UniProtKB/Swiss-Prot annotation:
The keyword Repeat applies. Gene3D superfamilies: Ankyrin repeat-containing domain, Beta Polymerase, domain 2. CDD domains: NT_Rel-Spo_like. InterPro entries: Ankyrin_rpt, Ankyrin_rpt-contain_sf, NT_sf, RelA_SpoT. Disulfide bonds: none annotated. This is Putative ankyrin repeat protein RF_0381. Keywords: ANK repeat, Repeat.
Length: 1179
C-alpha cells in the first residue's frame, strides 16, 4: 500500500489506527487519498487531516490530543467546506467565498487544496463514472468554486486546467468525445509529427548556431470547446490545437528562425503575425506563424526571445492576458458562453472604462462528431467604451480584475453591473454607482431572467430595409443580434443607426455600423425593463458623428491596403479610442484642425503628424508642418513621420517632409532607415528620389541588412536592378554573414540569382558558420538552383566550420537527385566523415547503395573511428545493417573509444537489430574503453524490453564501468522507475557504490523522481549511505532544493544531523542555498541549529555571510547561539561588521548579542556597532 511508505510518522499512524477503528474500508481509501495528496503536492498533515475527517463523527476530544493544531485546523476547514454539498447550486459560490473569509490567510491555500482531496476521490479520479449523478454534482462544485480560486494562483494554473478538462469530461461527455474524434482525425500520428518537427527545429538551431529550446503543448478538449464557441469557428478551423514555442537568445534570432521556417515549411501567409515589431497592448511580443497541415490539422508556432518569454509568463503581459474570463451555462441542448473583458484605469482625474462583452449561443447536436462538415451557427456582438471626468474619485478603486455585464452612463452617473468570480456569488451582480459627488454605492442585485421570445423585426431606415433577429438572454443586460440588410439605391447614404423603439414592453436600443452592402453584420442591442417611474429611455448614448466618420476612415479599403497592418491598426485604435478621440477626430476634419491648431501642444502636433500619415489623413499633414510639427520627432520605436510616408509609398508627402527638414537617413530603434521603409513599400520612384537626395544606400539595420537585402527578400527585381545601378554593394553581409544572394536562393528566385551573379555577387560567399550559397540552394531543394550556381563556379567541395560539405547536406536531406548532381559535378564522396556515414545514419538503404556504386568507401572511418556500420546500427535499420554486412562491412569493428556495432544498436533501442547482431556473432559482453557494456547502453536508451531481453540472454546485470557505475546507477540517473523495478526484480545489488561512493539512491535523488526514491527505500537501500566525501542522500536532496524529497527522506529515517567530511550538515547546505522553506522543514525534523563544521562555523555564520535577514531571524528564533565563536575565535558579529549589514546587526543585538565579549572586536568596530544601531538603547 502506498500510504504505508510514510507510516513512520506518528500522526499518520494514529490517524490510520482511528480510521481502521471506525471505518469499514480497510485498504483502498487511504491508498487513494495518499495518491491524491501527493499529486497535489500536499504534505503528511493534509493526508492525516483527510483521514481524520472521514470519520469525524466518531472522534472525541481525547482523539484530537494526538494531533497538532495545524492538522486539527485542516480537519475543521474540510468540515466547513463540505457543507457546500448541501447548498442549492445558486448559493454554492457565495457560501464558498463566505467560508474563505473565515480561513487563516497563511493556511488558506493549503486548506483549500486539502479540502479538494475528498472531492477528487468522490468523483473517482482514476475510474470515473460519468453518468453518476453524484459525480456530476461534485464536478459542478469544483467548477463553480475551486477552479476560479486555483486560477488566481499562477502556481496552480496547471491544476486548474486539468480539473477543467476533468469536469468537462463528466458534465459534457458527448461534446468531449466529439472533440477528441476530431483531434484524432486532424492529427492521426501526433507523436510522429512532434518528433519530426523537433528534429527539423534542431537542424535549424544548429544551422543558425544558436542555443534555443523548443516546447510544445496539445490543447485540452475543454479549451478547444470554449474557443470554438467564443471564436464562432469549427474545430477544423483552429490552428493551435498543436502548438510549438521556440525560445531563442534574442530578437535577431527570432527573425532568423522565422525565415528558415518559411523556407522549410508551407506556412499560411495570412496567419503570420509579428508581435515583436507591433506588440500587443499588454506588451506581449512574439512571432506567430502557422504551418499548413494540408487537409489535416495546422500547427501553430510561436518564436520569442528569452526576455520576451519572461515578460509573457511572469510580467505585465501575463497579467493583462489573464483579464479575459468566460462563463458557460447549459439549458437542455443550448449552450451559452459569455466572454467578458474590462479595463479600468485612473489617471489625470479620468476613469476610463473599456468593456468587451461577447455572448455566444450554440445548439448542441450529440451526433455532430459523425459529420466533419457540420459548423454550428453562432451570434455575437462587439465592444463598447465610455469614460467620464470627476472631481476626486481616488477613493474608488477596484482592486481585482472585474467583468461587467452591463454599463450605463446617465446624468453624470456611471453604473456598472460587475460579475467578479473572486468576490461575488454566482447568481448575483455587484451594482457599482459612481457620481461627481465622490460617492460610491455598492449593491448586490439578483440576476433576473426575462422571458422574451426570439423576434424578427423589419423596418426601413435611410432607404435600406433592415431585418433584425435577436434573442435576449438576461434582463438588464446587453444581448446580441444579427442584422441583415439590402441596399435599395446606388446613392443610398448608409450611416450608423441608433434606434430606440418599444417591443414586448421592453425599450430597445440598436446600434450598428454597416460596412459592406448586401451582407450580414453584427449589432449591439441593449434593453431595459419598463418601469413607470423610470426616466431612463436610453442605456447607451448614441455614438458621436466624429467617431463614426473615424471608423469609416479606418475601414476604408485603400487606407488599409496602404497601411498593410489592419489587425495592428484596429487593435491600436480600439484600445486608445476613448483617450485619443478628441485629438484623432481633428485629423478627419482639416477645417476643424485649422481652427484649433494654436491650442494643440507641440508634442501633440508631432503625434498627430505621424498618426495622420498612418491613417492616410494626408490633408492634415501640410497644416501641421506649417504650424510647427517636428518632422523628426520619434515615437517609442524611433519612427519619424518620413518613415510613415515611405511605408505608405507616398512620394509627394516624402518630398514635403524632407523639404521641411525631415532626416532622410533617420533610423528606427532596430536600425531601419527611411530607404528601408521605401523599399518595403515597393515604390520605385520614391526609392530613386531618396537615393538622389542623399539617402544612404549602404545603410544597415541592427542585424546588418541593407536595402538590397530587403529588395531581394521582397522578390522585387526592378528595385534590385535600380539599387545595383546606384551602387549598392551586392556582397554586403548581414551580421550572420548572409549576402543578398543567400536571400535570393532562400526564396528560390532564379531570375534574381542570375541578376545578382551577373553584377558581381560572390557565388562562394560564406556565412559566419562557413555555409556557401550552394548550401542554401541544397536546403531549398532545387536542382535547377544548384545547377545554376555550379555553372557560375560554386565550389561543390567547400566546407563549413565543422568540416561538412554541401554533399553532406544533400545526403542528410535524402534527395538523390541533388546527391547525383553534386557528385557528377565533382563533389568528393570520401571525406573524413564521409557522405556514406551521413547516408547510413539516415537509414536510407537506396542512397547508401547508390553511393557505394559511385565509389564511396564502405570501410571508411571518421576521425573518432566510427564505421559506416556503426551509423547504420544507430539508425536502427536492420535491412541496411544486413546489407552492409553482406557487402563485407566488419561486424566486429570498434570506434577509438571501444564502442562496437552492438553498442550503437543498443543505443538505438532496437531489440530486433540487437537480437540479429548477437545471432550473427556480435559479442554481448563487449565493453567500451570506459567499461560500459551493451546493457549499460540499453539502459541509456530506456528500452525496457531490450534490457529485459539482454538480461534473459545472460548479459551481466552486475557489470561495472571503470568508475564503478552499475546498470542500476544508469537507470536511476535517468529517473526510469520501470527500468529500476526490472533490475531489482532481476537481482541487482541496490546498495552497490561507485568508486566515489555514490549509491543508486544518490543518482535517483539527483533525477528528482520522488516515486523512484520511494521505491529504492522501500526495497531496502541505505537511506543514510555516504559518498567518499561524506555526503548523504539528504545532502543531495537539500542541494537539489526539493521539499518533497527532503520530507520523504526524513519520514523514512534519514539522519538530519549527519555531517560531511568537512563537518557540514544538511542545514548548512539549506542555509547556503538561501532556501527558507527547506531550513524551516529541517528544523521541524530536529536539525541542530548550532551544529559546527570543521572550521567551527554554524548555520548562523552562513546566513550572515550570505546576507539573509529572513534566515538569520528564523535561526535565532529557533535557538541559534548568536555569541558562538568559530575556530579562529570570531563570532557572527565579526561577519556582520565585515558585510556592514545594519538590519542583521539590529536583529542580533535585539536578540541578546554580547558586544562586550572579551577580545571580540577591536574598539573601532565596537564603535561602528553603536553607530549603526544608534537608535537602539543597548545596556
Amino acid at each position: 500500500m502506498l500510504y504505508q511508505n510514510i507510516t513512520n510518522n506518528s500522526c499518520i499512524n494514529q490517524a490510520l489506527e482511528l480510521y481502521h477503528k471506525y471505518c469499514y474500508d480497510k485498504t483502498t481509501y487511504p491508498d487513494q487519498i495518499h495518491t491524491i495528496t501527493k499529486a497535489l503536492q500536499l504534505d503528511s498533515s493534509s493526508f492525516t487531516a483527510v483521514l481524520l475527517h472521514e470519520n469525524i463523527q466518531h472522534l472525541n476530544l481525547e482523539d484530537y490530543n494526538h494531533f497538532n493544531n495545524n492538522i486539527i485546523y485542516l480537519v475543521d476547514v474540510i468540515n466547513k467546506l463540505s457543507t457546500i454539498h448541501y447548498k442549492p447550486y445558486a448559493e454554492q459560490y457565495i457560501h464558498f467565498h463566505e467560508l474563505l473569509l473565515t480561513i487563516n490567510p497563511k493556511l488558506q491555500e493549503t486548506a483549500i487544496l486539502t479540502s479538494l482531496v475528498p472531492l477528487l476521490h468522490k468523483v473517482s479520479i482514476f475510474n470515473l463514472e460519468y453518468n453518476n449523478t453524484n459525480a456530476q454534482h461534485i464536478s459542478e462544485i469544483i467548477t463553480n468554486c475551486y477552479i476560479p480560486y486555483l486560477l488566481s494562483y499562477t502556481a496552480h494554473n496547471d491544476l486548474a486546467y486539468l480539473l477543467q478538462d476533468l469536469c468537462f469530461k463528466i458534465q459534457y461527455p458527448e461534446e468531449r468525445n466529439r472533440i477528441l474524434h476530431y483531434m484524432y482525425w486532424l492529427y492521426p500520428d501526433i507523436d510522429n509529427i512532434i518528433h519530426n518537427i523537433e528534429q527539423q527545429f534542431g537542424n535549424i538551431f544548429r544551422k543558425l548556431n544558436i542555443k534555443a529550446s523548443l516546447s510544445y503543448r496539445i490543447k485540452s478538449p475543454y479549451s478547444i470547446w470554449i474557443k470554438t464557441l467564443v471564436k464562432d469557428i469549427h474545430i477544423t478551423a483552429l490552428n493551435d490545437i498543436l502548438a510549438f514555442r521556440a525560445i531563442v537568445p534574442n530578437k535577431k534570432a527570432c527573425y532568423d528562425v522565422s525565415k528558415l521556417i518559411h523556407l522549410h515549411y508551407n506556412t499560411i501567409t495570412s496567419q503570420f503575425v509579428d508581435y515583436i515589431r507591433y506588440p500587443k497592448n499588454n506588451g506581449y511580443q512574439s512571432i506567430h506563424l502557422v504551418i499548413s497541415g494540408g487537409n489535416k490539422g495546422n500547427i501553430e508556432l510561436q518564436i520569442r526571445s528569452t526576455t520576451m518569454h519572461r515578460q509573457t509568463q511572469y510580467g505585465s503581459a501575463h497579467h493583462t492576458y489573464k483579464v479575459n474570463k468566460y462563463y458557460v451555462s447549459r439549458t437542455n441542448n443550448n449552450v451559452s458562453v459569455v466572454l467578458f473583458n474590462i479595463t479600468l484605469s485612473y489617471s489625470n482625474r479620468i476613469l476610463s472604462v473599456y468593456v468587451s462583452i461577447v455572448t455566444i449561443t450554440s445548439t448542441i447536436n450529440n451526433n455532430l462528431y459523425t459529420d466533419y462538415n457540420t459548423i454550428p451557427s453562432f451570434t455575437q456582438y462587439t465592444q463598447h467604451s465610455t469614460n467620464f471626468v470627476d472631481n476626486d474619485i481616488t477613493t474608488c478603486t477596484l482592486s481585482r480584475t472585474t467583468t461587467p455585464e452591463y454599463i450605463t452612463y446617465y446624468n453624470n452617473n456611471l453604473s456598472l453591473l460587475i460579475k467578479d468570480t473572486n468576490t461575488i456569488p454566482y447568481n448575483f451582480f455587484l451594482n457599482i454607482n459612481l457620481n461627481l459627488s465622490n460617492t460610491v454605492e455598492y449593491k448586490l442585485v439578483p440576476l433576473a431572467v426575462v422571458q422574451i421570445p426570439a423576434s424578427n423585426l423589419l423596418f426601413e431606415h435611410n432607404s435600406v430595409f433592415i431585418n433584425i433577429t435577436y434573442k435576449p438572454i438576461l434582463a438588464e443586460c446587453a444581448f446580441p443580434a444579427t442584422i441583415t440588410y439590402t441596399k435599395r439605391h446606388e446613392d443610398s447614404n448608409i450611416r450608423s443607426i441608433f434606434k430606440l423603439f418599444e417591443h414586448n414592453s421592453v425599450f430597445i436600443n440598436i446600434t450598428y455600423k454597416p460596412i459592406l452592402a448586401e451582407c450580414a453584420f453584427p449589432a449591439t442591442i441593449t434593453y431595459t425593463k419598463r418601469h413607470e417611474d423610470s426616466n431612463i429611455r436610453s442605456i447607451f448614448k448614441p455614438p458621436s458623428p466624429t467617431y463614426n466618420t473615424l471608423l469609416a476612415t479606418i475601414n476604408d479599403k485603400v487606407v488599409l491596403e496602404q497601411y498593410g497592418q489592419k489587425e495592428f491598426l484596429s487593435t491600436t485604435i480600439n484600445t486608445n479610442i476613448t483617450q485619443m478621440l478628441p485629438i484623432i477626430t481633428l485629423l478627419v476634419d482639416p477645417s476643424e484642425l485649422n481652427k484649433r491648431i494654436n491650442d494643440i501642444s507641440d508634442s501633440n502636433k508631432d503625434q498627430l503628424l505621424r498618426l495622420g500619415l498612418q491613417l492616410g489623413c494626408v490633408e492634415s499633414v501640410p497644416l501641421l508642418i506649417t504650424h510647427g510639427a517636428n518632422p523628426n520627432a520619434t515615437n517609442c520605436h524611433g519612427v519619424i513621420s518620413l518613415h510613415c510616408a515611405a511605408k505608405n509609398g507616398n512620394l509627394d508627402l516624402a518630398k514635403l517632409l524632407a523639404k521641411n527638414g525631415a532626416d532622410v537617413n533617420a533610423k528606427t530603434d532596430n536600425g531601419e532607415t527611411v530607404l528601408h521603409y521605401a523599399v518595403k513599400s515597393g515604390n520605385l520612384h520614391l526609392v530613386k528620389w531618396l537615393i538622389e537626395n542623399q539617402a544612404n544606400i549602404h545603410a544597415k539595420t541592427d542585424n546588418g541588412e541593407t536595402v538590397l537585402h530587403y529588395a531581394v527578400s521582397f522578390n522585387n527585381s526592378d528595385l534590385v536592378y535600380l539599387l545595383i545601378a546606384y551602387g549598392a554593394d551586392v556582397n554586403a553581409k548581414t551580421d550572420n554573414g548572409l549576402t543578398a544572394l543567400h536571400y535570393a536562393v532562400y526564396d528560390g528566385n532564379l531570375d534574381l540569382v542570375s541578376l545578382l551573379i551577373s553584377h558581381g555577387a560572390d557565388v562562394n560567399a560564406k556565412t559566419n558558420s562557413g555555409e556557401t550559397i550552394l548550401y542554401s540552394a541544397v536546403d531549398y531543394g532545387s536542382p535547377d538552383l544548384v545547377y545554376l550556381l555550379i555553372a557560375y563556379g560554386a565550389d561543390v567541395n567547400a566546407k563549413t566550420d565543422n568540416g561538412e560539405t554541401v554533399l553532406h547536406y544533400a545526403v542528410e536531406s535524402g534527395n538523390l537527385d541533388l546527391v547525383s548532381l553534386l557528385i557528377h559535378n565533382g563533389a568528393n564522396v570520401n571525406n573524413a566523415k564521409t557522405i556514406l556515414h551521413f547516408a547510413a545514419k539516415s537509414g536510407n538503404l537506396n542512397l547508401v547503395n547508390w553511393l557505394i556504386k559511385n565509389k564511396a568507401d564502405i570501410h571508411a572511418k571518421t576521425n573518432s573511428g566510427e564505421t559506416i556500420l556503426h551509423f547504420a546500427a544507430e539508425s536502427g535499420n536492420l535491412n541496411l545493417v544486413n546489407w552492409l554486412i553482406k557487402n563485407k562491412a566488419d561486424i566486429h569493428a570498434k570506434t577509438n573509444s571501444g564502442e562496437t556495432i552492438l553498442h550503437f544498436a543498443a543505443k538505438s533501442g532496437n531489440l530486433n537489430l540487437v537480437n540479429w547482431l548477437i545471432k550473427n556473432k556480435a559479442d554481448i559482453h563487449a565493453k567500451t574503453n570506459s567499461g560500459e557494456t551493451i546493457l549499460h547502453f540499453a539502459a541509456k536508451s530506456g528500452n525496457l524490453n531490450l534490457v529485459n531481453w539482454l538480461i534473459k540472454n545472460k548479459a551481466d546485470i552486475h557489470a561495472k564501468t571503470n568508475s564503478g557505475e552499475t546498470i542500476l546507477h544508469f537507470a536511476a540517473e535517468s529517473g526510469n522507475l520501470n527500468l529500476v523495478s526490472l533490475l531489482i526484480h532481476n537481482g541487482t545489488d541496490i546498495n552497490t557504490k561507485t568508486d566515489d561512493g555514490l549509491t543508486a539512491l544518490h543518482y535517483a535523488v539527483e533525477s528528482g523522481n520522488l516515486n523512484l526514491v520511494s521505491l529504492l527505500i522501500h526495497k531496502g537501500i541505505d537511506v543514510n549511505a555516504k559518498t567518499n566525501s561524506g555526503e548523504t542522500i539528504l545532502h543531495f536532496a537539500v542541494d537539489l532544493g526539493s521539499l518533497d524529497l527532503v520530507s520523504l527522506l526524513m519520514v523514512r529515517g534519514a539522519d538530519v544531523n549527519a555531517k560531511t567530511d568537512d563537518g557540514l550538515t544538511a542545514l548548512h547546505y539549506a542555509v547556503e542555498s538561501d532556501n527558507l522553506a527547506l531550513v524551516s522543514l529541517l528544523m521541524v525534523y530536529g536539525a541542530d541549529v548550532n551544529a559546527k563544521n570543521n572550521s567551527g562555523e554554524t548555520p548562523l555564520h552562513y546566513a550572515v555571510i550570505f546576507n539573509s535577514l529572513d534566515l538569520v531571524s528564523l535561526l535565532i528564533h529557533n535557538g541559534a547561539d548568536i555569541n558562538t565563536k568559530n575556530n579562529s575565535g570570531e563570532t557572527v558579529l565579526n561577519s556582520i561588521m565585515e558585510f556592514n549589514n545594519c538590519n542583521i546587526l539590529k536583529s542580533f543585538i535585539l536578540g541578546g548579542a554580547d558586544i562586550n565579549l572579551e577580545t571580540m572586536l577591536p574598539d573601532d568596530q565596537t564603535d561602528s556597532i553603536i553607530n549603526l544601531c544608534g537608535d537602539l538603547r543597548i545596556s
